[in-house]
Amino acid sequence: LGHLLVKLYRRNPIQLPAASSIETRVEQLKVPKLDLQEFGGPKPDDLVRMAFHEDFTGDRAYAFVAGLQSMVNHVFDHRREYLLLDDLPLAQFVYNSARNIETAAYLLRTQRNSSGEPYLYADGIQDGVLNASYSQLMGEMIGLQDALSKALAKKDQRALNAVARGAASFVFLPVGF
């Protein structure tokens, strides 16, 4: 998501606050629990939508990406690493996160202000060539989360199968000689 933020700032330099730098904004995304107080502390999905409100006067690029990052952080319980015996995130939540990124990608492509201009410039035609790098980047994130959700779902199914086999094995009582 840091890469997406850099690309959005390069395409929408007016969104970067004067007192900040791209590097500072990217570093702010790396904190496991994002500070969203500059936006009034909204829920992550509200923050993504806020970037496309006509009356919003803040940093639309950061609001959009920080909302996505906050959603992803929430799915992973605001953790950056997992150890072998740790509980992993629920497959359904990871799957839902991928769908949320799809929705955000759609909003990025389609939302326009009252004068017909996009709130955030992203994909578009430049010099007669389609630049779909934003959609590709978001598609990559969606694909990674889909693959992870499938792997987690299979892990859960294996665990359920192991529990069922374990329970079935206790049907027979041990006999001594």
Predicted region positions:
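N-terminal Sec/ER secretory leader and immediately downstream segment
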Residues: L1-V65
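Mature extracytoplasmic/lumenal regions of exported proteins
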Residues: P44-F177
